[in-house]
Each structure stands twice: as structure tokens, then as C-alpha cells.
Amino acid sequence: MIKDEAYLDLLSENFVDFDFERCSSSNVFAYAYNEKTNVLIVAFKGGKIYQYLRVKPSIYHGLQKAESKGKFINSQVIQKGFKYRKYEVQEPENK
């Protein structure tokens, strides 16, 4: 399992136009939104990262206010069928 700070650094380095917000969710590690491109990025614990396309600002603002980030993402993003790109982070091998 990748360490939290290393995961956050990786996100910031690879998605430079996004400011990630950490959250205290059992499934969601962090999320970020770019209002210029309407892209929402959700980084899940365990290393899966989803980049959701054409997400309205109102969805992002709802996510910010949601008590359960995971439930909100499931009902308002995943179940709504937003197109996405999926990435997966793997722990580097020790040599």
C-alpha cells in the first residue's frame, strides 16, 4: 500500500491543474475539480484514480458538502454514468 504522503505527491505531480482535498472517508483518499475543464478526479484508497469528464460545478459543490463522500460519488457520479478515465497506482518495487 502506498503511503499517504507519497500518494498525495503523486497526485499533485501528475495532475498539476488540480488542488486535491483530502477527506476522512473509508474509501476516498482525495478529490479535486477543475472548473475550466469540468473534470473531477477521485483518488480512492488502494490506488485507483478516476478522472470523470463533463462534471458540472454543482456536482463538485455537492461533493464538498456531502457527509459521506463515497456515497455521494456513487450516487451522483458513478450511477449517473459520467464518462471517465481510470488510472491505477502501484507500489514501486524495491531493487
Spans of features found by a protein language model:
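Acidic/histidine-enriched, beta-strand-rich ligand/metal-binding domains
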Residues: 2-95
